[in-house]
Amino acid sequence: MADGISSFWGPVTSTIECCEMNYAYSSYIAEFYNTISNVPGILLALIGLVNALRQRFEKRFSILHISNMILAIGSMLYHATLQHVQQQSDETPMVWEILLYMYILYSPDWHYRSTMPTFLFLYGAAFAIVHAYLRFGIGFKVHYVILCLLCIPRMYKYYIHTEDTAAKRIAKWYVATILVGSICWFCDRVFCKTISQWPVNPQGHALWHVFMSFNSYCANTFLMFCRAQQRGWNPKVKYFLGVLPYVKIEKPKTQ
């Protein structure tokens, strides 16, 4: 929320502000809670990346975890500054990331191997160029939701073809986190005037970041399990510190 407090970054130039008082804790951080709430996303992506590298999963999963980290860092920059350029560093990686998910989901059954990655790369590059010059506003949200919806049929197909109970539980956590996170985001956007009058702001957008951090981790872990099944790597779900699920594989000696 805009206010009259002076800041290091100057006037707000982003097209979106969340329901949090600007520069309440520091003249260097516009939205404090919305900034620090991206830390779980970075840590979870780092854990996933280490697991993918240690067990030599396909490079696509390492890139996916790295894209999660880039998105979280871009979001931190955006909410810390509320500048239009930093807003693009948040929104453009969101689209790139979902395009990467589309590749991982659909590529196993795609007969023309070079066609899909080429198209998705050109699409992502074109979007980045256009987005650098145009402020889409609601158009960006609609575009992003459409891309997300295109992933649902394949995610559901993987779910119904997975018999492992632990893997299915991860998929259910994926659905639960995105639903709860979306409710937090919606309330923060729609009921901000009412929330601002409460004694304590629940920081709905910050909660959205936290839930989506776990959502991305669950999605990545579930997809790693499904891909390992396709490759015959005998995947099993294990738990880091007894809480955080990850995929343990046993590759045949020939691989």
From Swiss-Prot:
Q: Key word Transmembrane present in the record?
A: yes
Q: What does UniProt note about where in the body, tissue by tissue, this protein is expressed?
A: Mostly expressed in roots, shoot meristems and pollen, and, to a lower extent, in mature leaves.
- Coiled coil: which residue ranges? none
Intracellular or extracellular location(s): Endoplasmic reticulum membrane; Golgi apparatus membrane
Q: Which cofactors are required for activity? A: Zn(2+)
Q: Which residues lie on this side of the membrane: Cytoplasmic?
A: 50-60, 113-118, 161-169, 227-255
Native organism is Arabidopsis thaliana
Name of this protein: Alkaline ceramidase
| Binding positions for Zn(2+) per the UniProt entry | 79, 205, 209
Q: Where are the transmembrane segments?
A: 29-49, 61-81, 92-112, 119-139, 140-160, 170-192, 206-226
GO cellular component labels: endoplasmic reticulum; endoplasmic reticulum membrane; Golgi apparatus; Golgi membrane; nucleus
- Can you tell me which family this protein belongs to? Belongs to the alkaline ceramidase family.
| S-S bridge residues | none
Q: Name one Pfam family in it.
A: Ceramidase
Q: Name one GO biological process term.
A: response to abscisic acid
Which ranges make up the Lumenal topological domains here? 1-28, 82-91, 193-205
